[in-house]
Amino acid sequence: MRNFLPKFSIVLLFSVQTGILWAEDGRDRLNAVIGKMNSLESFRASVTVNGGLTGVVSYKSPNQLHVRFSDGRIISSNGRILWFYNPDSSIAGKQDLKGVSGGLGGLLSGYENVSVSGRTFRLTSNTKRYNEIILVVSDNDLPRVLKMKRSDEEITEVAFSGIATNIGLGTGLFNFQPPTSSQIVENPLNQKE
């Protein structure tokens, strides 16, 4: 599951002495981007993870997500349960989302340092799962690139293209059930490595 989890990190943000003004400007601009994403009823986009793995991500408010990768793996959430499914191993992770803040706002919140240069945001923190996040947005404040760097230097980069917003997405897409023959791992994100 560990190798699969960084790919979930779908959807790159962005600091010192000139700090307070940069941080406030960066936070304000970042909040505007998060507000834009939160205002969308739905979206669909093509994604490329680390320059290789491709897929399609679909989102419907509130908190419904479905990602189908080119290798058959699926990440899906109806807002209450998050599934990770790998058809090669027939293993499915089932994560209870009760009490979890999600979305772009959840990923980008709590960073001590936020700076912005043009359309590139940089967020840094020594206490977060990702020590650095870079977010590049388009002219209409939709994500183009999200790069997340952990303290062990592992980097996950997600590039978005062909984003379509406020499209009709049926609820059934987000009610994923793995094949009955799958091995289910309960709450894999709560387990210690």
Locate predicted features.
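An acidic-aromatic
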Residues: 52-103, 156-157
